[in-house]
Amino acid sequence: MKVIVVKNQLEGGKIGLDLLKESINNGAKTLGLATGSTPVEFYNQIVNSDLDFTNMVSVNLDEYVGLDGSNEQSYRYFMTKHLFGEKPFKENFLPNGKATDLEAEAKHYDQIIEENPIDWQILGIGQNGHIGFNEPGTPAEITTHVVDLQESTIKANARFFESEADVPRKAISMGLASIMKSKNIVLMAYGKEKAEAIKGMVEGEVTTELPASILQNHANVTVIADEAAVSLLSK
């Protein structure tokens, strides 16, 4: 696991863009994408770049249950606003949070990932160590699944909604096994509130109690983090 320490999100976004360009030059065709505040500057860098995604496919990590793509809090809306609206892809895949049969939708999404192996995956990390919506206790072998969101995740995401009560309680998420199939993974983390999770992920033991720690078992992981996020690392 390679750790790159940056001054701020702007520098992190630029380094992320360089890594993405390198991967595309090496033949990457499918990008795994994440949402939330962490990758926004990275997406800004992409939008202002000369990259062309019209022959590429994107696969997003997750989506809230109950929100359709026109809802401003849905992850499809987020992706359209920050990336897809400016940089069209050949195809964009996100879980369908309005599916009538959520378990069938999860299986369908596994099939999409099988047909579109992810070459380059961007990740954030939650304060509790979640990646995607894989909360503490999630089995390592799980693929796409329906998740009951933990209170800490609901509280962390409440800032994007009018009130905490409006935050969906469920999501569909790629599983840890799905994420681990990605050829290359770049995880971004900013701020001191991520420091405990980063320490556990990089230096702790691999445990389901800190889902991101499974990334220690992946051959190609790069962490882009600011000084605050790496402040608890011993080396």
Swiss-Prot record:
GO terms for molecular function: glucosamine-6-phosphate deaminase activity; identical protein binding. InterPro entries: Glc/Gal-6P_isomerase, Glucosamine6P_isomerase, Glucosamine6P_isomerase_CS, NagB/RpiA_transferase-like. GO terms for biological process: carbohydrate metabolic process; glucosamine catabolic process; N-acetylglucosamine catabolic process; N-acetylneuraminate catabolic process. The active site is at residues 62, 128, 130, 135. Pathway: Amino-sugar metabolism; N-acetylneuraminate degradation; D-fructose 6-phosphate from N-acetylneuraminate: step 5/5. GO terms for cellular component: cytoplasm. Keywords: Carbohydrate metabolism, Hydrolase. Belongs to the glucosamine/galactosamine-6-phosphate isomerase family. NagB subfamily. Catalyzes the reversible isomerization-deamination of glucosamine 6-phosphate (GlcN6P) to form fructose 6-phosphate (Fru6P) and ammonium ion. This is Glucosamine-6-phosphate deaminase. The gene is nagB.
